[in-house]
């Protein structure tokens, strides 16, 4: 797992992070939490193509899946963040997403006796600040682990694919499906997605050239 030396996993830190993740006060109008887009019933992702923020503005991407982030090396769809502690700060201040400022978030949390206690348990006295909030959120996200899917069981040798599943797996790994070139094989180190992402590649969805060219 990718766990920074200055943010070791603790029960208290993860507990605080869980409270923050589900708290709508992290948004500008107190209406949207992280879990508002990263839906638990959708594996902490969302079943829509684009996310909508507190001001009703639809973004250009959707909320990424949050499971198994402890093994991920890059964050956001374009990989611009290299730690979870860095990543969790941005959605709060993004004007298209939660449209808030961290100083305002901290002020709200300081007025809640529950958070005073949770921060103290996790990080000591007078610990309510942006850095510790980010550390707590990162700790919680690293606890979201899935490792018992059919594919996990297949890799462990405890499950045999059905004929249809085997066909899909074979197609993934051959030139017909052509999935493996970007997402890698089962042995690829986890970087992004259920399989590894070998590199960030233009998928052609936003091509700007004229179809007549």
Residue ranges and their predicted role:
Residues 54-142, 213:
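Periplasmic c-type cytochrome electron-transfer domains
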Residues 1-90, 152-213:
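Short glycine/threonine-rich turn/loop motifs
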Residues 1-5, 127-159:
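Small beta-barrel nucleic-acid-binding modules, principally OB-folds
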Residues 97, 146, 150, 177-178:
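Intrinsically disordered or highly flexible coil/loop and linker segments, enriched in small
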Residues 13, 102, 115, 147, ...:
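N-terminal alpha-helical segment
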Residues 26, 111, 125-128, 146, ...:
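Alpha-helical structural elements of signaling/regulatory helical domains
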Residues 45, 94, 112, 147-148:
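Short alpha-helix boundary/capping motifs
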């Amino acid at each position: 797992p990718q766990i920074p030396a200055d943010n070791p996993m603790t029960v208290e830190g993860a507990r605080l992070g869980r409270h923050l993740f589900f708290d709508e006060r992290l948004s500008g109008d107190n209406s949207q939490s992280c879990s508002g887009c990263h839906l638990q019933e959708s594996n902490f992702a969302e079943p829509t193509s684009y996310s909508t923020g507190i001001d009703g503005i639809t973004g250009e991407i959707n909320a990424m899946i949050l499971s198994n982030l402890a093994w991920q090396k890059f964050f956001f769809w374009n990989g611009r963040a290299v730690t979870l502690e860095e990543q969790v700060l941005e959605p709060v201040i993004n004007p298209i997403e939660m449209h808030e400022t961290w100083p305002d978030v901290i002020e709200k949390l300081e007025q809640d006796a529950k958070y005073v206690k949770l921060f103290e348990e996790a990080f000591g006295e007078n610990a309510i600040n942006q850095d510790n909030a980010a550390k707590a959120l990162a700790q919680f996200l690293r606890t979201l682990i899935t490792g018992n899917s059919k594919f996990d069981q297949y890799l462990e040798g405890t499950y045999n694919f059905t004929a249809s599943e085997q066909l899909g797996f074979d197609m993934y790994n051959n030139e017909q499906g052509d999935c493996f070139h970007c997402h890698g094989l089962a042995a690829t180190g986890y970087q992004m997605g259920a399989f590894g992402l070998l590199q960030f590649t233009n998928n052609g969805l936003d091509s700007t050239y004229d179809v007549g060219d």
